[in-house]
């Protein structure tokens, strides 16, 4: 095989390795994002349940505010 053929095969191999590495990185990032979304949902659900339980004892409503959920006689917005 000539030197040009070897260089061409080497180049193709490098391109293949680089693209498969990028695909693996994108897949890993997607999985990481999915895990973060699940954690946020479970945390939000837990906070909301606690808020509803606490507000129910005070006979108030659990309202979402800028500072997070809080108890109020009536929710606005």
UniProtKB/Swiss-Prot annotation:
InterPro entries (alphabetical): Conotoxin
Domain notes: The presence of a 'disulfide through disulfide knot' structurally defines this protein as a knottin. The cysteine framework is VI/VII (C-C-CC-C-C).
Domain of life: Eukaryota
Family in the record: Belongs to the conotoxin O3 superfamily.
Keywords from the named record: Amidation, Cleavage on pair of basic residues, Disulfide bond, Knottin, Neurotoxin, Secreted, Signal, Toxin
Residues excised as propeptide: 23-44
Positions bearing Phenylalanine amide: 76
Cell compartments where the protein resides: Secreted
Signal sequence annotation: 1-22
GO cellular component: extracellular region
Disulfide bond recorded as keyword: yes
Name of the protein: Conotoxin ArMSGL-0143
Disulphide-bonded residues: 51-63, 55-71, 62-75
């Amino acid at each position: 095989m000539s030197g040009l053929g070897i260089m061409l095969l080497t180049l193709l191999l490098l391109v293949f390795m680089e693209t498969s590495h990028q695909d693996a990185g994108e897949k890993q990032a997607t999985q990481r994002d999915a895990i973060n979304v699940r954690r946020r949902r479970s945390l939000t659900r837990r906070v909301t349940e606690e808020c509803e339980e606490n507000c129910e004892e005070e006979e108030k409503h659990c309202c979402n505010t800028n500072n997070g959920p809080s108890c109020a006689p009536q929710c606005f917005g």
